[in-house]
Amino acid sequence: MAKSLVLSSLLLALLLAAPLASLADNNVLLTGDVLHTDNQLSFESAAFVMQGDCNLVLYNEAGGFQSNTHGRGVGCTLRLNNFGQLEIHSANSNTPVWVSLRNGIPVRGDYAAVLGPDQHVTIYGPAIWSTPAPNRHERGATVSNIPRVRNVLFSSQVMSDNAQLATRDYSLVMRDDCNLALTKGSKTNIVWESGTSGRGQHCFMRLGHTGLIEISDDRLNTVWRSNTVGQEGDYVLILQINGQAVVYGPAVWSTASPARGGASAAL
């Protein structure tokens, strides 16, 4: 299967051009989002596709994944529920065709499925911190060697010296004046900020393995922290296209780890 998935990935990337029905970028599926038939999450050469035959398939260079639901429904869609599970729904049934398993006790909340630089899909959540929603009518110091993603920061990664997350016209910037600022459009249009301008030199922001965001100066003094701490694990900070920066975690499921919750339940 892995060989066929790799050989087909480039062809699918060209054929499946329909946009994701989501308020997130094309590498992220949030709770409440819907991935319609023949739509996909994509990152670089990897694609996570809700196929027309009702099979959910991850095409990558790392072994791939599939839900094994070929022919089990019509007009199938993929959703991320508020317990951190992926659900495949058929247009002709009210019962899910397939639901992913998950680690730990299910907790209701907002989750995020991210197709990351490891070419696997991992679900993080629930959300434990966020900047304020800019529009309520819109929906809702070790440097890691994880490759950088434009709109996502992973646990142990660091931002400094005007590094930023970006999506559409929003940017979350760790400014060289020690202020963490969320801007829309121009650099001067600040939507949210940590309010730490001038409080340190050579400051950096780090996302820890408990979901804590911390700004420190070059002497490792804490300048600001989000004060939201979850259980130990892997977290992500996602800059969403509705202008919110949200921390999700810990990881509860991954296509990379079937023995630890990555297996799936076909109903």
From Swiss-Prot:
The keyword Disulfide bond applies. One of its GO terms (biological process) is response to other organism. Residues 1-24 form the signal peptide. Disulfide bonds join 54-76, 178-203. Residues 26-136, 150-260 form the Bulb-type lectin domain. CDD domains: B_lectin. The keyword Signal applies. Mannose-specific lectin. Has weak agglutinating activity towards trypsin-treated erythrocytes from rabbit but not from human. This is Mannose-specific lectin 1. It comes from Crocus vernus (Dutch crocus). The gene is LECCVA1.
